[in-house]
UniProtKB/Swiss-Prot annotation:
Gene3D superfamilies: 3.40.1280.10. Specifically methylates the pseudouridine at position 1915 (m3Psi1915) in 23S rRNA. Homodimer. Belongs to the RNA methyltransferase RlmH family. Its main location: cytoplasm. CDD domains: RlmH-like (cd18081). PANTHER family: METHYLTRANSFERASE, RIBOSOMAL RNA LARGE SUBUNIT METHYLTRANSFERASE H. It catalyses: pseudouridine(1915) in 23S rRNA + S-adenosyl-L-methionine = N(3)-methylpseudouridine(1915) in 23S rRNA + S-adenosyl-L-homocysteine + H(+). It comes from Syntrophomonas wolfei subsp. wolfei (strain DSM 2245B / Goettingen). It is an enzyme of class 2 (transferase). This is Ribosomal RNA large subunit methyltransferase H. Keywords: Cytoplasm, Methyltransferase, rRNA processing, S-adenosyl-L-methionine, Transferase. Its EC number is 2.1.1.177. It is found in: Cytoplasm.
Length: 159
């Protein structure tokens, strides 16, 4: 099973990027994982709802280019299901046994994701009911994927 994290927003802060890269590297012995970021369209601070929806549609077109039919799409959204680390590990195990080629985690930028992209998802999860900057959410997600694999292997890390 391969994994992919798509972050519509670019990871600009070096400390977040270094952390994400570290967890992706640590995942190497367990799975193949890649990060795609920077699909975000520019939007002015005074954009109205109509302009925001148009931007979300443009971002949706970019996202679709990265999606495959033979994958599990997992959208991260504040309204998604919150899981414990142990539950996340069990879900990783189920996805690994699904016969699909890849699991793609998708995180929107500041204005979220187009509804049509959300509706394509097989799963919608939330890291927390708290709101995080998208860069931090990518880092937390990468860490939780790593933690999940460590739990599944019964290896020390998770306490």
């Amino acid at each position: 099973m391969k994994y992919r994290i798509i972050s519509v927003g670019r990871i600009r802060e070096s400390f977040y990027l270094e952390g994400v890269r570290e967890y992706l590297k640590r995942l190497g012995p367990y799975t193949s994982i890649e990060l795609i970021d920077g699909l975000e369209e520019k939007i002015g601070p005074r954009a109205g709802e109509k302009e925001i929806q148009a931007i979300l549609q443009k971002e949706a077109e970019k996202i679709r280019r990265w999606l495959d039919k033979d994958e599990i799409l997992v959208v991260l959204d504040l309204e998604g299901q919150v899981r414990s680390s142990e539950e996340m590990a069990r879900q990783l195990e189920k996805w690994n046994a699904s016969g699909k080629s890849r699991v793609t985690f998708l995180l929107g930028a500041a204005h979220g994701l187009a509804n049509e992209i959300k509706q394509q998802a097989q799963e919608t999860i939330s890291l927390s009911r708290l709101t995080f900057p998208h860069q931090m959410a990518v880092l937390i997600l990468a860490e939780q994927i790593y933690r999940g694999f460590k739990i599944l292997k019964g290896e020390p890390y998770h306490r």
